[in-house]
């Protein structure tokens, strides 16, 4: 046990009803919330102050337990509109959550239910009342941890069995989780970005056609594409290049998603490689970025602790500007492995890891971070306009301003 080993928070006096058991045998006790049961997953931490519902329903968090570093939780409740999972009935996203404080009563006009009830409905096991700073420090020092999170209202746990489950879990390396979170069949997405006056509108006159390969896509990504005039046809992760081209797209989008890019890439990389050669504009985010790098001849690697939060500084070499972005990934592209015809366009100012690339002479680019920013900043919304401008250029149309003009 090191100095950073988390212990039950000193102000917690309730009987333990949940435990987090790490692969090294460390046991952390607290109050159980949400669903009951036990599940193996990787423990990470997220530094965002807001947007817990969007975080927990992001399919990229499949196979993970999210530790929230901000102490307050539940303030705005939960609702059906803020879910990021494309198919909410399947409940793709994080399997567990860890909080410092107990859930507070919601105080927001959009709240439909409290967070505890929502966690139960989503099947997410939660643990509260622990020293999340100490757990975060442990992850920072030792790396993302394989673990089991368990919740029993009676507080009955077979710790030896839970320790064995945590120690024997395979982890995220070599796991293809995209096949678990992707849609079962194609669909056309028409929903527009949310506004205070109208909520979510519906697109009626698209100007372009984008095919999105769904490796775990977030709804807000699709909304931003429709908001720029694109009809979006979403295809399953296993779609072939021939499947994509049969829709006669003006552009192709490679979505975010969970798991190891090398594992999903077993079937996705050949498809991406063929699409790159067509000359059709192509844009990738997160897992899509990583698999594009693999298709171009690069390599990916597992990160020590990953990047998870809405306050990450990234430098855009194409403009010289620094952006504050939202990130959620545990694997990264090895920039030294990229071939000469591929330029690094973005880099993390936290650790220097690759955050973007483009192919010289082709309308192909991608980023590691999440420019749709839900939750998070909007510094990177221009990337969607950059993608649409590649489509417009191919059609002989004038480009849009990359950043919206102030009213």
UniProtKB/Swiss-Prot annotation:
Domain Glutamine amidotransferase type-1: 209-397
GO biological process: 'de novo' pyrimidine nucleobase biosynthetic process; 'de novo' UMP biosynthetic process; glutamine metabolic process; L-arginine biosynthetic process
Annotated residues for binding of L-glutamine: 60, 257, 259, 287, 290, 328, 330-331
PROSITE patterns, A to Z: GATASE_TYPE_1
NCBIfam families reported in the protein's UniProt record: CPSaseIIsmall (TIGR01368), PRK12838.1 (NF009475)
Protein task: Small subunit of the glutamine-dependent carbamoyl phosphate synthetase (CPSase). CPSase catalyzes the formation of carbamoyl phosphate from the ammonia moiety of glutamine, carbonate, and phosphate donated by ATP, constituting the first step of 2 biosynthetic pathways, one leading to arginine and/or urea and the other to pyrimidine nucleotides. The small subunit (glutamine amidotransferase) binds and cleaves glutamine to supply the large subunit with the substrate ammonia.
Listed name of the protein: Carbamoyl phosphate synthase small chain
Gene assigned in the entry: carA
